[in-house]
Amino acid sequence: MDLVRFFIFIIFVIVSIFIILLVLIQDEQGDGIGGVFGGGSSSIFGAKSSSVAVKITGFFIALFFIFVVLLSFLNTRRADDSFLNDIKTENKNSSTFWDDENSESDANINEIKENNLKEK
């Protein structure tokens, strides 16, 4: 599972670099990401078709978010498993403490009861 996590992380880094490069090579005529907030004459749902660079950038942004969710899911599962394993280990070590103590005290109680019955 660690190998899969490593490859997903490498692909995540490559996708991040591609997003940076694609945003840098886009022209500043309102077609890019900055054009959404101050695009001037272009509209969000305009009839003008978006360029290939904008479509590719959108695709890589979608991949970026998919890999973010995958990595967070994989890392969360790993942290939960290791935490639960630590708790199980602690419980195994501590279970003998009260078992031994109770068995000795039970034997002592039985001896006391037998002695009391003999005295009566």
Swiss-Prot record:
This protein's UniProt keywords: Cell membrane, Membrane, Protein transport, Translocation, Transmembrane, Transmembrane helix, Transport
Q: What is its main location?
A: membrane
| Keyword Transport attached | yes
Asked if the keyword Ribosomal protein belongs to this entry, the reply reads: no
The UniProt entry lists membrane topology as: Multi-pass membrane protein
Q: Which GO terms describe its biological process?
A: intracellular protein transmembrane transport; protein secretion; protein transport by the Sec complex
Record GO terms (molecular function): protein-transporting ATPase activity
Cellular location of this protein? Cell membrane
Superkingdom of origin organism: Bacteria
What Gene Ontology cellular-component terms does the record carry? plasma membrane
* Membrane spanning stretches: 6-26, 54-74
- Role this protein plays: Involved in protein export. Participates in an early event of protein translocation.
What is stated as this protein's family in its record? Belongs to the SecG family.
Protein name according to UniProt: Probable protein-export membrane protein SecG
Task: Report the source organism.
Answer: Borreliella burgdorferi (strain ATCC 35210 / DSM 4680 / CIP 102532 / B31)
Q: What is the lineage of its organism?
A: Bacteria, Pseudomonadati, Spirochaetota, Spirochaetia, Spirochaetales
